[in-house]
C-alpha cells in the first residue's frame, strides 16, 4: 500500500509539472499571435485612411472586430521564471519560499487549490529536500490539502535555528575598514534583516563599525533619530571628504599632445582630427588603402580593420588593457568591506585580512593569493612596525625565485606565532614565514590553498570556503580576548635603548587566571604544600604592633577564613610569637580577609628556592614581547625619570624573550643603539646578584734543594 501511494504521488506530481509546462508554452504562443495581429492591424490602419462618409461603417466594423476578437490573455510566466530548485540549504530557504509565493500569486487561477500549491512546491525540490517532502506527505496525508501547514513544517525542518545568533555575531564583527560607507551600509542592512533589534540598538551597532574619521565628523553633527538618517549623514560626510581630498591634490600642468611615431610610407589623412570623432573616408582614400593592403581604420599595414589595435586602445581607458574588468565583488563576504583602488586595477588576487593580536588593536592588511608561492609569507618590515611576536624555525628554509636562484634576503629562519586571522566570516589560525616582501605585506601560497581548498572564481575575484576542512575547522567563531589592563609601574630599571618603551609580556595573558579563587588551592605538578616554618634564633624579642578589637561581623569573617584554610591544610599551628596583619575589605555582601606577611617574614628563615617559575623576574627586558617607539619630543618626560641622553641607532636585531611550550625561542624586534654617554647612565641591577670572586689559590711551596 505504501509503495502504491508513493507511486501515485510521484505520478501526480509529474503530471502537474507537465501541465504547467504545456500551459506556459500555450501562453507564449498566444502572446506571439496577439503581437503579430497587433502589428498587422497597425500597418493596415496606416495604409487605409477612413473617409468622413464611411465613419459609421468603420465604427460598426471596429465594434464587430472588437466583439469577435478574444479578450487579451492574462500575462503568464515563462518557464525561465520558475523558482530555483531547493536542495535543503538553510541559507536558500527564505528566497525559495518568496519565489514560490510570487510565482503562485501571479497565476492565482492555476494555483487556487492547496493541493496544487503543495504539489508545485514539492516539484521544485531536489536532493534531500525532495526526499523529506515525499516521506512527509506519505506519513501526513493532511498536509497535501493544507498548504500553510506544509510550509510551516518545511520551515521548521530546514530553517537554521542559530540564524539570529549567527547574524548577531556577524554584525558585531562587521567593520567598515578601508571600504566605502555605501558598501558597509548595504552589508549592515543585509545582516540586520535576520535580527529582532530595535532602532536604537541598530544605530549604536552601526556607529561601532564606522571608521574613525567618519565617527569624528559625526561628533560635530546632530544625532540622527533613525538608521536611514544616520546612513545618509555618513554618505554625505564621505562624499564631502572625498571632494576636499580631491581639491587638495596638486593639479599637474597640461601636457602637450605627442603624436605617435608613424612610418614614413604612411601618409597622414588631414581629415582625421586628433582626439575627436573620426570622419568618413573618401572613395579615393578607400581605394588607395585597399591597393596598398592598409587598414581601413587606422591606415597602417600588417592587419585589417576587424582586429585593429587602435579600436581596442580607444575603447579601453588610459592605463588599462582591453578586456573584461578584473574588479568584482568582495572575496571576503559581507563582513569585510573592500573597495577597489582609484588607480588601475591590480592583476593580482588581493584580499583584506584581519590579524588579531591579544590585548591590542586589530591589524588590517592586504594579502595576495599566489598559487606560485610555496608557503605563507609576511614582510619583516611589517612585523617590525607592528611588533608581531616571532620565534626561530626548527629548520631554515631556502626560498628560490622564478629563475631558480635564491632570493636576496637569504633563507627564512623566523616565523610568527600562531595568529588568529579573519577573512570575512572565515577564521583560522595561521603562522607566517618572515621574509622580505615590500609590495605585498602578506602572501598566501600553496600551503594555504591546499589546506582550505577554496572555490575561487577568478573572473569576479570571489572566494567561497566550502571544503570539508573549512566546514569543521575554520567556521568556528572564537571570542577575541579583551584588551589588557594598563601596565603596572615598571621597576626602577634603565637600559641604554632610549626611544623604546617596554611593555608587559603578552604571552602571559593566557595564564592570567591562574590565581583565581577556583585555582587558589591547586599547586603546580601536584606538589604537596610544606607549611613548616623555621624561626630566626632570638625572634621572641622582636617588638610587635598594636592589637585592635574586631566587631562581630569581622570576627565571624575571620573565624570562617581561618576554619576554611585550616580544613584545606593551608594554615597550621605555629610557634611564632606574632602573626600577620589582618585587613578586612568589604566586597559585595561579604568581608574579604587579606593579610600582610612582611612582618612575620622578618623573623622567619626564608627558603632559598625561587618562589616563581618565571625566569629573570626582575629583568623587565626579558619579559617584553614587543616594544613601542617613543618619538623624541622636546619636553617629553621619559619613564623612568632618569636623565635621557641621545642615542644613535646602529642596527636592527631580534631580542630573545623566552621560550614557548615547545621549547622554541621567542624573539621581538629591537633597535641596537650606541650611546656615547653610557658612563653617565644609572647602573643596571643584576639578578641574581653576582657572587664575590673566589679567593686566589695559595702559592705553591718553594722548591726543595735538599740532596740525598
Swiss-Prot record:
Region (Disordered): 21-74, 310-344, 683-708
Coiled coil region boundaries: 1-50
Superkingdom of the source species: Eukaryota
UniProt crosslink position (Glycyl lysine isopeptide (Lys-Gly) (interchain with G-Cter in ubiquitin)): 311, 314
Expression sites (tissue/organ): Expressed in the cytotrophoblast layer but not in the overlying syncytiotrophoblast of the placenta. Expressed in prostate and breast carcinomas but not in normal breast and prostate epithelial cells. Expressed in the Hep-G2 cell line (at protein level). Expressed in brain, liver, spleen, kidney, thymus, lung, ovary, testis, reactive lymph node, skeletal muscle, adipose tissue and placenta. Expressed in pancreatic and hepatocellular carcinomas (HCC).
GO biological process: apoptotic process; cell differentiation; mRNA transport; negative regulation of transforming growth factor beta receptor signaling pathway; protein homooligomerization; vesicle-mediated intercellular transport; viral translational frameshifting
Practical uses of the protein: Can be reprogrammed to form virion-like capsids that deliver engineered cargo mRNAs bearing RNA signals from PEG10 5'- and 3'-UTR into target cells.
Keywords of this entry: Apoptosis, Coiled coil, Cytoplasm, Differentiation, DNA-binding, Isopeptide bond, Membrane, Metal-binding, Methylation, Nucleus, Phosphoprotein, RNA-binding, Transport, Transposable element, Ubl conjugation, Zinc, Zinc-finger
Keyword Transmembrane part of the UniProt annotation: no
Biased composition (Basic and acidic residues): 37-48
Sequence positions bearing Omega-N-methylarginine: 507, 598, 611
One GO molecular-function entry: DNA binding
Subcellular location: Extracellular vesicle membrane; Cytoplasm; Nucleus
Zn finger intervals (CCHC-type): 293-310
Result after altering residue 370 to A: Inhibits proteolytic cleavage
Residues covered by region (Necessary for interaction with ACVRL1): 76-275
Metal-binding keyword on record: yes
GO CC, one annotated term: cytoplasm
Induction (UniProt): Expression is directly regulated by E2F1 and E2F4, which bind to its promoter and direct its expression. Up-regulated by MYC. Strongly overepressed in a number of tumors, such has hepatocellular carcinoma (HCC), pancreatic or neuroendocrine prostate cancers.
Polar residues composition bias: residue spans: 26-36
Function in brief: Retrotransposon-derived protein that binds its own mRNA and self-assembles into virion-like capsids. Forms virion-like extracellular vesicles that encapsulate their own mRNA and are released from cells, enabling intercellular transfer of PEG10 mRNA. Binds its own mRNA in the 5'-UTR region, in the region near the boundary between the nucleocapsid (NC) and protease (PRO) coding sequences and in the beginning of the 3'-UTR region. Involved in placenta formation: required for trophoblast stem cells differentiation. Involved at the immediate early stage of adipocyte differentiation.
More about this protein: The PEG10 locus is imprinted, giving rise to paternally expressed proteins.
Quaternary structure (record): Homooligomer; homooligomerizes into virion-like capsids. Interacts with ACVRL1. Interacts with SIAH1 and SIAH2.
Domain notes: The protein is evolutionarily related to retrotransposon Gag proteins: it contains the capsid (CA) and nucleocapsid (NC) subdomains of gag.
Protein name according to UniProt: Retrotransposon-derived protein PEG10
Native source organism of the sequence: Homo sapiens (Human)
Amino acid at each position: 500500500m505504501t509503495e502504491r501511494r508513493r507511486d501515485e504521488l510521484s505520478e501526480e506530481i509529474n503530471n502537474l509539472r507537465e501541465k504547467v509546462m504545456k500551459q506556459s508554452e500555450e501562453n507564449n504562443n498566444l502572446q506571439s499571435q496577439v503581437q503579430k495581429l497587433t502589428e498587422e492591424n497597425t500597418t493596415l490602419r496606416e495604409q487605409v485612411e477612413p473617409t468622413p462618409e464611411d465613419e459609421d461603417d468603420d465604427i460598426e466594423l471596429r465594434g464587430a472586430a472588437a466583439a469577435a476578437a478574444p479578450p487579451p490573455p492574462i500575462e503568464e510566466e515563462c518557464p525561465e521564471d520558475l523558482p530555483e530548485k531547493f536542495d535543503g540549504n538553510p541559507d536558500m530557504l527564505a528566497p525559495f519560499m518568496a519565489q514560490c509565493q510570487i510565482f503562485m500569486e501571479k497565476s492565482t487561477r492555476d494555483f487556487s487549490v492547496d493541493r496544487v500549491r503543495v504539489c508545485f512546491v514539492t516539484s521544485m525540490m531536489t536532493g534531500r529536500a525532495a526526499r523529506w517532502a515525499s516521506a512527509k506527505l506519505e506519513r501526513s496525508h493532511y498536509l497535501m490539502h493544507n498548504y500553510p501547514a506544509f510550509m510551516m513544517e518545511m520551515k521548521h525542518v530546514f530553517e537554521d535555528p542559530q540564524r539570529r545568533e549567527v547574524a548577531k555575531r556577524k554584525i558585531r564583527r562587521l567593520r567598515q575598514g578601508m571600504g566605502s560607507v555605501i558598501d558597509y551600509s548595504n552589508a549592515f542592512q543585509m545582516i540586520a534583516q535576520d535580527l529582532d533589534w530595535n532602532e536604537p540598538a541598530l544605530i549604536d551597532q552601526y556607529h561601532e563599525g564606522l571608521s574613525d574619521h567618519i565617527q569624528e565628523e559625526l561628533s560635530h553633527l546632530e544625532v540622527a533619530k533613525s538608521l536611514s538618517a544616520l546612513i545618509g549623514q555618513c554618505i554625505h560626510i564621505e562624499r564631502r571628504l572625498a571632494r576636499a581630498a580631491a581639491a587638495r591634490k596638486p593639479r599637474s600642468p597640461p601636457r602637450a599632445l605627442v603624436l605617435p611615431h608613424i612610418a614614413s610610407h604612411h601618409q597622414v589623412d588631414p581629415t582625421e582630427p586628433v582626439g575627436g570623432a573620426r570622419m568618413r573616408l573618401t572613395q579615393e582614400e578607400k581605394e588607395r588603402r585597399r591597393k596598398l593592403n592598409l587598414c581601413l581604420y587606422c591606415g597602417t599595414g600588417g592587419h585589417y580593420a576587424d582586429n585593429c589595435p587602435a579600436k581596442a586602445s580607444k575603447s579601453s581607458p588610459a592605463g588599462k588593457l582591453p578586456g573584461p574588468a578584473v574588479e568584482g565583488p568582495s572575496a571576503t563576504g559581507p563582513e569585510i568591506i573592500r573597495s577597489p583602488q582609484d588607480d588601475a586595477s591590480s592583476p593580482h588576487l588581493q584580499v583584506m585580512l584581519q590579524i588579531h593580536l591579544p590585548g591590542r588593536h586589530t591589524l588590517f592588511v592586504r594579502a595576495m593569493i599566489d598559487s606560485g608561492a610555496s608557503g605563507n609569507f609576511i614582510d619583516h618590515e611589517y612585523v617590525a612596525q607592528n611588533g608581531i611576536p616571532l620565534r626561530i624555525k626548527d629548520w631554515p628554509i631556502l626560498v628560490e625565485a622564478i629563475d631558480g636562484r635564491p632570493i636576496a634576503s637569504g633563507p627564512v629562519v623566523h616565523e610568527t606565532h600562531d595568529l588568529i586571522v579573519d577573512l570575512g566570516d572565515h577564521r583560522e589560525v595561521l603562522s607566517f614565514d618572515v621574509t622580505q616582501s615590500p609590495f605585498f605585506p602578506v602572501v598566501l601560497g600553496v600551503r594555504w590553498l591546499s589546506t582550505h581548498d577554496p572555490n575561487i572564481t577568478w573572473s569576479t575575484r570571489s572566494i567561497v570556503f566550502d571544503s570539508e576542512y573549512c566546514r569543521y575547522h575554520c567556521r568556528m567563531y572564537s571570542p577575541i580576548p579583551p584588551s589588557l589592563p594598563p601596565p603596572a609601574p615598571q621597576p626602577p630599571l634603565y637600559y641604554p635603548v632610549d626611544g623604546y618603551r617596554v611593555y608587559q609580556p603578552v604571552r602571559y595573558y593566557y595564564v592570567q587566571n591562574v590565581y583565581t579563587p577556583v585555582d587558589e588551592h591547586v599547586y603546580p605538578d601536584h606538589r604537596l604544600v610544606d607549611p613548616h616554618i623555621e624561626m630566626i634564633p632570638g625572634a621572641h624579642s622582636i617588638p610587635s604592633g598594636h592589637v585592635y578589637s574586631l566587631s562581630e561581623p569581622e570576627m565571624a569573617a575571620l573565624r570562617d577564613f581561618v576554619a576554611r584554610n585550616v580544613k584545606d591544610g593551608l594554615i597550621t599551628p605555629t610557634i611564632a610569637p606574632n602573626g600577620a596583619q589582618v585587613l578586612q575589605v568589604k566586597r559585595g555582601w561579604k568581608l574579604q580577609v587579606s593579610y600582610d606577611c612582611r612582618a612575620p617574614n622578618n623573623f622567619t628563615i626564608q627558603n632559598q628556592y625561587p618562589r616563581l617559575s618565571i625566569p629573570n623576574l626582575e629583568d623587565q627586558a626579558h619579559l617584553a614581547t614587543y616594544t613601542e617607539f617613543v618619538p623624541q619630543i622636546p619636553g617629553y618626560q621619559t619613564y623612568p625619570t632618569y636623565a635621557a641622553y641621545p642615542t644613535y641607532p646602529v642596527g636592527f636585531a631580534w631580542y630573545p624573550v623566552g621560550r614557548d611550550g615547545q621549547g622554541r625561542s621567542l624573539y621581538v624586534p629591537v633597535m641596537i643603539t650606541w650611546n656615547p654617554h653610557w658612563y653617565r647612565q644609572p647602573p643596571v641591577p643584576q639578578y641574581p646578584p653576582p657572587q664575590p670572586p673566589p679567593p686566589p689559590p695559595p702559592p705553591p711551596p718553594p722548591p726543595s734543594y735538599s740532596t740525598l
